[in-house]
Swiss-Prot record:
GO MF annotations, alphabetized: acetylcholine receptor inhibitor activity; ion channel regulator activity; toxin activity
Protein name per UniProt: Short neurotoxin 1
Annotated TM spans: none
Source organism (scientific name): Acanthophis antarcticus (Common death adder)
Chief location bin: secreted
Annotated stretches, region: Disordered: 1-20
Length: 62
């Protein structure tokens, strides 16, 4: 599984997820800096107020 792992509006980068990981995530939230985007492997739990998208194809979280 290949997932994007760049932060916010940085140039696209990808990572190969460890064995057994079959999903990618994209978390989005706002703070004093503006909209923050975090991407990576897996599908983590998030706090209320954080938007989470999980998907199951290569680089689907761009």
């Amino acid at each position: 599984m290949q997932c994007c792992n760049q932060q916010s509006s940085q140039p696209k980068t990808t990572t190969t997820c460890p064995g057994g990981v079959s999903s990618c995530y994209k978390k989005t939230w706002r703070d004093h800096r503006g909209t923050i985007i975090e991407r990576g492997c897996g599908c983590p739990r998030v706090k209320p107020g954080i938007r989470l998208i999980c998907c199951k194809t290569d680089e689907c979280n761009n």
